[in-house]
Amino acid sequence: MKSGGIGEILFLCHRIPFPPDRGDKIRSHNLLRKLCEIAPVHVGCFADDARDMSFATELGDISASQKIIPRNNSRVLAGLKGLANGQPMLVALFDHPVMHNWVREILAARPISAVVAYSAQMAHFVPVLEEGKRFVMDFVDLDSAKYTAYGEGQGGPLGWINRREGRVLLDFEKAVAVRANVSTFVSEAEASLFRAVSGLSTGKVRALENGVALDYFSPDAQFERLSPEERGTGPLLVFTGQMDYRPNIEAVDSFARISMPAIRDAHPDARFAIVGRSPTAAVEALASLPGVTVTGAVADVRGWLAAADVVVAPLRIARGIQNKVLEAMAMGRPVVASAQASEGIDVQWDRHLLVASNAGQEAALVLKLLADKQLSADLGKAARARMVERYDWSATLAGVPALIGG
């Protein structure tokens, strides 16, 4: 940690930023490490479970101080509280008096010159700051747009709840952005969308892109390869992600039920591996379909990526930049993605990855790659080169000191 000339930093995030093994933690982890290069950082965050709490030592090794609070708010009660108070339910779900008190204590006791809030649900912990203290709001994604998309065409109470959350959360996001010195989003596409709905300028709303750990996610790195039994002999298609997350669940369900039968008509021994922790019952049930494997949590996702003939990202709802796509491309694998999953990534379609508009086209593009080994190899090589050229974390986070210093 360096003391520099700006004082200290308070970093608030909705999950402990260790380990960097899921989308939100990958960004928060790398952002925290960048902040620690600038000044001492005090970290306030929540833990989803005992596993999260077990990383307190690792967080303590790089932070000046920390407050980790187990998160056990009921979704139902948070929803009712949000409705009663006119709050977004996402904010009510993460509300906690201990965090409010800790933030006030840190601001009073330490020479904090900048507060960085990560994700919309942490913004309400940031009080009105004294003159000279900067408030940087990293929204990451435009969450209100995600809930609006959930509610579109969805009837019944759940549809109403999602549409209401989209409206109320957008109002909250706009109010926070007006108060913050600067707000950041994971891609220029996401930042541009928020500028359009908020009326704020490029000076107030900027892109702060994700990167990828190029030395770690490299075909030349040292990692445990799949055994012949795990790999199998037929074509292997792989999806990676947190498997209790709705967009991921819907993506693998569509691919397993619609795309895989068409692929297996041409390749009866083709397999689709769904790789990621916390699969729901609905995801686990997909393993009963021909050629579908559900791995659950794996020690190292690189073994599955390296073994894949094609990595697929068939998301229908996606915000920001998909780390799963960056990681697969960094591993030099050919990727077939939906337009939604590729949005925000600075690549050329058909040169760095293939993009499909529906489940039928996803199957067709996978079959195209399986039939043309040279195309597959060229696509993977170009994908890796583009990640090296464009998405090194040191480059994507190079603007952070200016955001903090003003």
Predicted regions and their residues:
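Acceptor-binding helix/loop patch of EC 2.4 sugar-transfer enzymes
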Residues: 14, 73-93, 133-174, 192
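Nucleotide-activated donor-binding/catalytic signature segment of Leloir-type glycosyltransferases, i.e.
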Residues: 65, 267-303
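Acidic anion/phosphate-binding donor-loop and adjacent secondary structure
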Residues: 148-149, 195, 212-228
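Short hydrophobic beta-strand element within catalytic cores of glycosyltransferases
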Residues: 324-327, 334-338
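Conserved acidic donor-binding segment of nucleotide-sugar-dependent glycosyltransferases
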Residues: 353-360, 368-374
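A short, well-ordered alpha-helix in the C-terminal region of glycosyltransferases
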Residues: 375-389, 399
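Carbohydrate-associated surface elements
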Residues: 189, 208-211
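Acidic donor-binding loop of glycosyltransferase active sites
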Residues: 181, 291, 306-320, 331-334
